[in-house]
Amino acid sequence: MKLIKNGKILKNGILKDTEILIDGKRIKQISSKINASSSNIEVIDAKGNLIAPGFVDVHVHLREPGGEHKETIESGTKAAARGGFTTVCPMPNTRPVPDTVEHVRELRQRISETAQVRVLPYAAITKRQAGTELVDFEKLALEGVFAFTDDGVGVQTASMMYAAMKQAVKVKKPIVAHCEDNSLIYGGAMHKGKRSEELGIPGIPNIAESVQIARDVLLAEATGCHYHVCHVSTKESVRVIRDAKKAGIHVTAEVTPHHLLLTENDVPGDDSNYKMNPPLRSNEDREALLEGLLDGTIDCIATDHAPHAKEEKAQPMTKAPFGIVGSETAFPLLYTHFVRRGNWSLQQLVDYFTIKPATIFNLNYGKLHKDSYADLTIIDLNTEKEIKSEDFLSKADNTPFIGEKVYGNPTLTMLKGEVVFEEEK
């Protein structure tokens, strides 16, 4: 057994002194004081820090199979554990794509061999993510895939998305969508606005995202499908999702830390560490995202952790791949910028990473109580640390946040009662 002493948990927004007794994989007792005298008990000193439920990230890219030069299941899940995550859901833009039962089984085998945290894989919506032929939803659902998505690309035709939603309803699984109309991208590498004009870099307009969301929420209404929108980035998208929810359509949405923290004006020049998809938008868009998150239009935060090799990101923005890493920096950045400055409560932030994503996808994770799995993370809210690439457990360090000084760093993460990350002393 394990006993975590000298910790604090959030109860109705208030930090309470807490000890947690763990028996095997599950929590046996949570109390302000636990008297356990057995010599078999391993004591973990939380040192007065927060004990939070293990975080749930419904949007990561682990790159394996096919992209192991960028990231592997092992390195990506080590990075997740360092960031406090105990459950991650990897996107299907791998090679091969998890679009058949055989490919999903091969992926699960890899996961079972090297994953450091719980991994719930998505299956693709269309074969090879080519947008022309649906996967076998029934067989893949029976195989236990988390949900269906073609993330990395948008489903370009309404007829294909309509057919996919009807199949998803039959198997009672969500459709998760990267919303991007290819006919409106115009070869863009950042947001289309004043800053892109100043830099002479082609831009992607807001409507490339929002028109596809508008299309899809109507299809979701017609089919009754649970439709989840990935990485919302524009004010128009927030408005469409808000209106859809008011109309009773089953739509949920996520937002990334970088879209909450940065705008097009933060792009210093031709620096591919500021290139992600969707791109960093205007400050007006960022404010709409913050408002949407706080009023419940946007349901949760997801990292869209997207690692790339150094040589790939060393290219100009017009040639480099989209994406930044985020698993190891998400919570500290948001805690530092929003909670410490009094804009959010600590309870709100923890919920965005735990119970909110778990609830919208009907996952029995993201909470701490008697008999639940001992999935948790201990977080130091008071010590300032600098984000350094040499500290990353990910294979990649493509992020604009290197050098930022942050609070709220996880010091230990536990999955089913086993320590999967512990800060070096």
From Swiss-Prot:
Coiled-coil features, chain-numbered ranges: none
Binding sites annotated in the UniProt record for Zn(2+) 2: D151, H178, H231
Keywords of the record: Hydrolase, Metal-binding, Pyrimidine biosynthesis, Zinc
Cofactor note: Binds 2 Zn(2+) ions per subunit.
InterPro entries assigned to the protein according to its UniProt record, in alphabetical order: Amidohydro-rel, DHOase, DHOase/Allantoinase_Hydrolase, Dihydroorotase_CS, Metal-dep_hydrolase_composite, Metal_Hydrolase
Residue sites binding Zn(2+) 1 per the record: H59, H61, D151, D304
Catalytic activity, EC: 3.5.2.3
Catalysed reactions, semicolon-separated: (S)-dihydroorotate + H2O = N-carbamoyl-L-aspartate + H(+)
Names of required cofactors: Zn(2+)
Family: Belongs to the metallo-dependent hydrolases superfamily. DHOase family. Class I DHOase subfamily.
Task of the protein: Catalyzes the reversible cyclization of carbamoyl aspartate to dihydroorotate.
Name of the protein in question: Dihydroorotase
Species in which this protein is naturally found: Staphylococcus epidermidis (strain ATCC 12228 / FDA PCI 1200)
